[in-house]
């Protein structure tokens, strides 16, 4: 074997092209590159739901490093652990996990600074392009950014903590901006160098890239005199280490680095035939991608990009992309203050960076970018308002879909196309992730979310239920299990399967500490709705009275239990702060107590007005995901609490389900939700009429020439949200069934209405962040549409 390696080293005849680099640095360079590959492998273990294996790998390598006696730092290991803990923290939002991530990422910041100084001091050139220490500027920016996000997302952070987080964000922004400019300036050099390395690799007959050893070049043959035995032995060792690093990178890119079988060829368009009315998508996609690079040549490109350069590029793109998107989501009042000091975000630029990273990078940065995109587009909170779409640009009408398979570069025109219809591209990348990481339910959860966003609720719940029903499947990461169970519970609620929904919400008590009171309140609301379904005869039961008593008892049990889990309420004294939905449920229960005093002889379930679960469904974007059948059932159930003979009420003088008079405040909530349901069924004009006559007119007293409104407090989120939803009604009416579409006029009219929503929604109120993000998303989307015309 040694003889073979000697021969290989002789053939390659490695020699330095940079005389100012000390020879003993080459061992250190390869040691660092190997550390980076180890760190990337550890983070891949997390992506495959094998976090313990990843953590043990990092601990083992850190111990070996400390025992080696080397003065060379290993600053990548703390970052790898910090990234893993960051992902766990942001999946579950549990205080103790977030605090642990905060500590580790702070250590990673310090380690990165120290490693950067070391590389500069000893001129450790780990890149052909960037000066020594650049990679640890990136790890510093990454740890600073993730640390700032953890600090911002902690539920019990105060003003001081928030200020510290924003300061960290700004520091990360400055570092990333500096490195990003270097990357853009060096792009021609990088491409030229990649071509050169590929050419050298082909000519050396061994197809081993020397990209990880800056300062060396390969010659096709050795000189007739050969070299000294000492230099030859050194070359053999370098070649041995170089080959190990190459194989590590190769395994990571091909998906075999975790011991999993190499993923089979993935059909990126599988399922599109069923989910789109346009059957030509697959064939047209094949046409549109005929000139793209093949997977083999794409993999070849990846293998000849050094691990460090790959990390720098993907890390900067990911972090800068996240930063730009996060800053674009910050409410306008804070955003204006930050922009004064040159600190502002651009959502479109940020999303393009995330897409580019997710498509071209097979490492933690690529998969984290994909997760960000999936949460942004298909997550439970509406960060982007895809409802503002131009006629003819709907997903079902797009005939020319790009294939993302094997792409190592993405052009600006391709990114623009992807941003117009993101739902056609996230499933492609998700298929790849599921193939590379078959053991992680996180990717299955994301697939369920994508299916739900496409209106395939039944498929989504079947996928998620069958996974947990299979005893051979294990979910090691508790945060992922909690997310899967919560989302599945919401999807069941969207389908009016209230038994399964309530079961999932109650189960969350044992696996997640986010907001146990809210979980129980949701379960109680589901049991209440099942009670109403039985009362209205919408489900067949053998013994109606027995079933009514059963669901009444369950609803009362969990309504009474829910507030006992709310922090700092009653006897539950704790350092935790109440979350927005904790305040929501406490307000709802206060309303019930007031009605109990008003109607002392009525049963608890008869004191409740508008459907609580339907109100909660709105916050999780349920009406955009329901089928026509589910929407029609929602209309019937919402009518349960309506005043006798009122519009869209199920109650009349001869037959009535409700036992209490419907207050104006409760009627406003009911009509608001019914208007949204009507719009989702295609009855846009009717829905807008309901919204204006029964909701907005109750607090808007003047529209022209000056907008005036009365401040109402019964349901704080409702008043700005109703005006926000009116914006969507206006857009649909102005852009549908018109012979001559005036996009600019439609945008302006919609923005005028949105401005009124912002005026009504000024200040801090219950669920203000959620409402504010929706309005910000709508405003950004309208700006985008306006600039295009």
From Swiss-Prot:
<feature type="region of interest" description="Disordered">
    <location>
        <begin position="209"/>
        <end position="231"/>
    </location>
</feature>
<comment type="similarity">
    <text>Belongs to the IML2 family.</text>
</comment>
<comment type="subunit">
    <text>Interacts with lipid droplet proteins.</text>
</comment>
<keyword id="KW-0963">Cytoplasm</keyword>
<keyword id="KW-0597">Phosphoprotein</keyword>
<dbReference type="GO" id="GO:0005741">
    <property type="term" value="C:mitochondrial outer membrane"/>
</dbReference>
<dbReference type="GO" id="GO:0005634">
    <property type="term" value="C:nucleus"/>
</dbReference>
<dbReference type="InterPro" id="IPR011990">
    <property type="entry name" value="TPR-like_helical_dom_sf"/>
</dbReference>
<comment type="function">
    <text>Inclusion body (IB) resident protein that interacts strongly with lipid droplet (LD) proteins. Involved in LD-mediated IB clearing after protein folding stress, probably by enabling access to the IBs of an LD-stored soluble sterol derivative that acts as a chaperone in inclusion clearing.</text>
</comment>
<keyword id="KW-0539">Nucleus</keyword>
<feature type="compositionally biased region" description="Low complexity">
    <location>
        <begin position="218"/>
        <end position="231"/>
    </location>
</feature>
<dbReference type="GO" id="GO:0005829">
    <property type="term" value="C:cytosol"/>
</dbReference>
<dbReference type="InterPro" id="IPR019412">
    <property type="entry name" value="Iml2/TPR_39"/>
</dbReference>
<dbReference type="Pfam" id="PF10300">
    <property type="entry name" value="Iml2-TPR_39"/>
</dbReference>
<protein>
    <recommendedName>
        <fullName>Inclusion body clearance protein IML2</fullName>
    </recommendedName>
</protein>
